[in-house]
């Protein structure tokens, strides 16, 4: 994987740089409730500003469906972004963009209005690409989380302007290359979450890539059912047991060991600390019980597996982690991975919305080698798919 970074960009005196960032942050009552994505822009935007470029931020917000609206305007994000960057950020609407850009001074940073106010943005329309390109001299893509989309601002611009990866994009691509591109072996993957159906392509791809595949969450029940285990009234996609068997067969052929729980935490009701809570062997689940977490013996065995590995890719929780005590397996395994990473024996990469929340809950987000905030793009990377926004940067 070869792509140009900000190290290759040269003298920026008198240049205007279009930077695609991800500003699609959660907001409540006009305030940003999680500024993770804003903070991810700091390295790129401040570096370009310090080098004297006029910096224009391209981003989308919500789903305005090609129509301008106050609700989806990026105007309200100029101030929060300025706060995070520690320097002024102005806002430019599409009505006055050319004059406003011309009036900017070297080093100035401005947020352009929502790219999705153009109907052609999501269609990668050449006219929209040209409209964006007319404002700048150089294109920087710093939004890995939008790299799975072939849109005008994420893919099209890279073909008409000199294109570079921003610092956040560069860090993400290097981490992912280390995890699955050219990993140190043995490699383990933890895949959890509620449904097999949402991660079928991930599982199919991983069995040919990793040495150990650890399956948890509700999706483990479908694999247990495929192996003839009665899972009671657990969440289970019985119509996919055939597909689960195929994945297990392919794992055998590829030399990938699949780890399923052999003891589980069950309950008759799904509430915090229910009276019917118990731990049992997977073959002892009663007809009126639900499997809600991986059991402690299996977690201990999985921790031993991680101790033999050099690389870990993690996506999805081991159990219903939002409700105690069904967070125990996720927390214990995450803490093992974090400890191994801190001592230098494991490279750990994790991503996906639920995953970040689960690792936050375990208090280990800062201890993993790399945490991706990308949802769909991270999953598509785990599926082995080419990401248009990344492919356009390669040269």
From Swiss-Prot:
Residues annotated to bind substrate: 22-24, 37, 60-63, 116, 149
Catalysed reaction equations from the record: (2R)-3-phosphoglycerate + ATP = (2R)-3-phospho-glyceroyl phosphate + ADP
Keyword line: ATP-binding, Cytoplasm, Glycolysis, Kinase, Nucleotide-binding, Transferase
InterPro entries: Phosphoglycerate_kinase (IPR001576), Phosphoglycerate_kinase_CS (IPR015911), Phosphoglycerate_kinase_N (IPR015824), Phosphoglycerate_kinase_sf (IPR036043)
Cell compartments where the protein resides: Cytoplasm
GO cellular component term, pick one: cytosol
Pathway annotation from the record: Carbohydrate degradation; glycolysis; pyruvate from D-glyceraldehyde 3-phosphate: step 2/5
Enzyme class, UniProt record, top EC level: transferase
Pfam families (alphabetical): PGK
Molecular function via GO: ADP binding; ATP binding; phosphoglycerate kinase activity
EC number: 2.7.2.3
Gene Ontology terms describing biological process: gluconeogenesis; glycolytic process
UniProt-annotated binding residues for ATP: 199, 322, 352-355
Secreted keyword on record: no
PANTHER family: PHOSPHOGLYCERATE KINASE (PTHR11406), PHOSPHOGLYCERATE KINASE 1, CHLOROPLASTIC-RELATED (PTHR11406:SF23)
Family affiliation: Belongs to the phosphoglycerate kinase family.
Subunit structure, interactors included: Monomer.
The protein's name: Phosphoglycerate kinase
Gene field: pgk
């Amino acid at each position: 994987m070869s792509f140009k970074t900000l190290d290759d960009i040269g003298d920026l005196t008198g240049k205007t740089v279009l930077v695609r960032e991800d500003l699609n942050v959660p907001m409540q009552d006009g305030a940003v409730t999680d500024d993770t994505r804003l903070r991810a822009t700091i390295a790129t935007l401040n570096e370009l500003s310090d080098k004297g470029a006029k910096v224009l931020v391209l981003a989308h917000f919500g789903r305005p469906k090609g129509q301008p609206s106050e609700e989806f305007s990026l105007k309200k994000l100029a101030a929060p972004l300025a706060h995070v960057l520690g320097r002024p950020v102005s806002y430019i609407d599409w009505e006055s963009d050319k004059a406003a850009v011309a009036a900017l001074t070297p080093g100035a940073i401005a947020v352009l209005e929502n790219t999705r106010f153009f109907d052609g943005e999501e269609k990668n329309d050449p006219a929209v690409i040209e409209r964006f390109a007319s404002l700048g001299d150089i294109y920087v893509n710093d939004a890995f989380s939008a790299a799975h989309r072939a849109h005008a601002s994420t893919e099209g611009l890279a073909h008409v302007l000199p294109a570079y990866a921003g610092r956040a994009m560069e860090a993400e691509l290097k981490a992912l290359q280390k995890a699955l591109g050219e990993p140190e072996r043995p490699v383990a993957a933890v895949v959890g979450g509620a449904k097999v159906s949402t991660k079928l392509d991930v599982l199919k791809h991983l069995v040919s890539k990793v040495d150990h595949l650890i399956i948890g969450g509700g999706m483990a029940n479908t694999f247990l059912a495929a192996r003839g285990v009665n899972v009671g009234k657990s969440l289970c996609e019985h119509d996919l047991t055939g597909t689960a068997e195929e994945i297990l067969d392919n794992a055998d052929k590829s030399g990938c060991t699949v780890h399923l729980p052999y003891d589980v935490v069950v309950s008759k009701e799904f509430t915090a600390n229910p009276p019917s809570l118990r731990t049992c062997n997977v073959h002892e689940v009663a007809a009126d019980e639900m499997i809600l977490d991986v059991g402690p013996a299996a977690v201990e065995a999985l921790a031993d597996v991680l101790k033999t590995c050099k690389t870990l890719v993690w996506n999805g929780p081991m159990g219903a982690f939002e409700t105690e005590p069904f967070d125990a397996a996720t927390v214990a395994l995450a803490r093992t991975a974090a400890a191994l990473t801190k001592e230098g024996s494991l490279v750990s990469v994790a991503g996906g919305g639920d995953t970040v929340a689960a690792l936050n809950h375990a208090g280990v987000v800062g201890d993993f080698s790399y945490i991706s905030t990308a949802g769909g793009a991270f999953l598509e990377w785990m599926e082995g798919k080419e990401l248009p926004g990344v492919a356009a940067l390669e040269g």
